[in-house]
Amino acid sequence: MLPRLSNVPQLNNVVSDYLSELQKQHFEGDIASNYADRLSLATDNSVYQQLPQAILFPKSVADVVRIAKLANKEKYLHLTFTPRGGGTGTNGQSINNNIIVDLSRHMTGILELNIEERWVRVQAGVVKDQLNQFLKPHGLFFAPELSTSNRATLGGMINTDASGQGSLQYGKTSDHVLALRSVLMNGEILDTSAVKSDDVLENYPLAENGKTLHQTIFQRCKEKRASIIQDLPQLNRFLTGYDLKNVFNKDESEFNLTRILTGSEGSLAFICEAKLNLLPIPKYRTLINVKYSSFDAALRNAPFMVKANALSVETVDSKVLNLAKQDIIWHSVKELLTEEEQNPILGLNIVEYAGNNQAKIDSQVTALCQQLDEKIAQGKDHIIGYQLCSDLPSIERIYAMRKKAVGLLGNAKGAAKPIPFVEDTCVPPEHLADYIAEFRALLDSHNLQYGMFGHVDAGVLHVRPALDLCDKEQVKLFKQISDEVAELTVKYGGLLWGEHGKGVRSHYGEKFFTPELWQELRYVKFLFDPNNRLNPGKICTPLNSNAELYSILSPMRADNDRQIPIQMRDEFKGAMNCNGNGLCFNFDEHSIMCPSMKVSKNRVFSPKGRAAMVREWLRLMANENVSPEQLDFHKTQVKLTALVERFRNSIQKWRGEYDFSHEVKAAMDTCLACKACASQCPIKIDVPSFRAKFFHFYHSRYLRPAKDHLVANLEVAAPYMAKQPALFNYFTKLKVTQSVVEKTLGMTDLPLLSEPNLQQQLVEIGYQGKKLEELEGLSATEKAKMLFIVQDPYTSYYDAKVVRDFVALTQKLGFSPILLPFKPNGKAMHIKGFLARFSKTAKTQAEFLNR
């Protein structure tokens, strides 16, 4: 029998008092402090993990003000806070061991739209694709693109100054932010927008509480203007995090403090609302998918595409393409990326033209295609062909494959997984090929596998080396590669963070600034957050502070995973392989993953959340000296002799005795076992599979509810009940029956058996069937027309008309349908964790079908 897990980190008294007092301050949002909630937000899309003290989910700007004002009471002055959006950051931006303020659950309102002036005002928790879905009927869109656009929030995009495909033309998020409403750590609301430079010092037009910040930073940036322009890298992906350069427009006639906040990663203020610039949706789009016999050829050929005035050029390597071919998404694009067996695609450039002038686009596409034809005819640049697509559905399918590539890399086989830590380096595009050649040589010298894809037009290529961070030697290599790549980007006049923000990589910040400018950044932090209470450890520390930035070797998920024996990790590899990509947070209600997450908006009830629960459950079990054999369901059985002890444990549970296993159970109970995660998640983590294993072990310690036995035995009972459907349906429809079942079993809307039953309905259509023994003597011609139909209990006994109609249809199509005898398949047993019974049932069914 497994032990009770009670040794989990507890809240300290000050945090507990703060949460209680906040509730009394009429805080309207949600407050979460149990271990499951804290674990669900302990990770993002990076390798890092830090357990927060608590999570706050404000519903309004007023709620955020309440959070900050209460935190300024003397008793709570040492508490720190980290704002959080979609949690899609790849460098630990939104995780910390403090109080997390998550704006993604409730602050999701689109507040105001001005179609004529082309702007929209939104709350920080609005998802990027959600906004564009709202804007599409008006012919407008928010331009910055990113691969996580279906779950990344606008607040998160602003805080990391996100950008992606098309940035050469559309720029970064900060280029489209017109104004912000933020809450400072002192509880004051700060409104920022562009103001005339002449008015900043004398006729200050904005709210008085922001005057000092505006004027001080204005003067400092004015005084340091020459060195700022001279010393910062001249890149399309300019330096994010307190953007000293772009606070002024080109002629310095306007000053905008908003540019300091964009890219600040929650280290200066809580960004709550934003006014965003919108663009017309291009009426016409064309993709040219150029295929190469090597990735290096695709890389070196990209500048040629950029010179052809393309909107964007995206490059993908063979590793990513091969992983895509193994995923369900390849079926949607294989006709758009055809290849010959003797000439496989080893590199791909996705070239897009877009605009409102069809003739101009056609001319550009024709010109590029003519040049490509010439190169192919001459055997130049290793081009093996190209394909065009101009219809929107095809274009969207290509980009969906490209976006999913990020997650697909995490599904590589083996313990070493491609991970993000040097994946968004940026160098001047003219140096990219040489830089990547040196980058690849560095990785090859360590015999590492890696995948590459990205925005070569902007000099950004995503590189994810494959490492197993459970191996301490590879953790050292992680640090070594980080250090070497940082030096390499400096050598080529680039940046370590061209797209995804700094996060923990702020550790390298000083390498990219002169000492003078680094002190200016620290001064900005001091002005906004002098006591280092907002997302401490990121971007920089306040001037005159002795605090330190996070190390590149900050606490990682692997530090916890390493405590779990390898055999346990293998047994629960579905949960262990989750890399945090967060596709299960997709806002779109039409995406099939994950129903419980969509309804509850609680990340505990998502595949990622459930995987995190099971990983921690395994770690705690290992720390209680539970052996791998005890968590191998093939070697364990729930014994009747333990019934008394299970009864005693269940009484203790009813009395409120804590066991972390109960929190895991609560997360698993809301899973519908629909298995959408098994196909839609790029990692294919398959929650129902490890959920069944967890239930098996959980109920070795605690009694099962009666409804579990009812559901598990349905397949066995249904054939007998179906012999008298009218009788059973009569009792099922009685109100007293429904009331008793709901109160005792928690089940409502019980289905009715089919009347007449399946056998009677088959007689009506003249189906006679054949015994299995008769089939063995049939000729090959007769067997070729046979169609075997395998029954399941739900259609055969509760929706028999479907089976009858299908049999009738196959007869009319000229087949000889054979309805196989019903045999339980054990699915219900598996869902409820009756694994021993399921294994026996599944084996019997398999032997029957393989006859």
Regions picked out by a protein language model, each given a short descriptive name:
Residues 1-72, 76, 86-118, 147, ...:
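N-terminal flexible segment immediately upstream of the FAD-binding catalytic core
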Residues 2-6, 202-248, 528-595, 601-609, ...:
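Flexible inter-domain linker/hinge segments
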Residues 40, 46-77, 81, 99, ...:
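N-terminal glycine-rich flavin-associated loop
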Residues 132-134, 142, 425, 429-447, ...:
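Iron-sulfur-associated redox domains of electron-transfer enzymes in respiratory
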Residues 154-250, 254-326, 330, 343-350, ...:
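Mobile "lid/hinge" segments at catalytic clefts and subdomain interfaces of large enzymes
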Residues 274, 308-416, 454-456, 599-600, ...:
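Terminal amphipathic helices with adjacent charged low-complexity linkers/tails
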Residues 412-416, 645-824, 829-851:
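Iron-sulfur-cluster electron-transfer modules
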Residues 550-581, 585-721, 839-845:
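Ferredoxin-type iron-sulfur electron-transfer modules in oxidoreductases and energy-metabolism complexes
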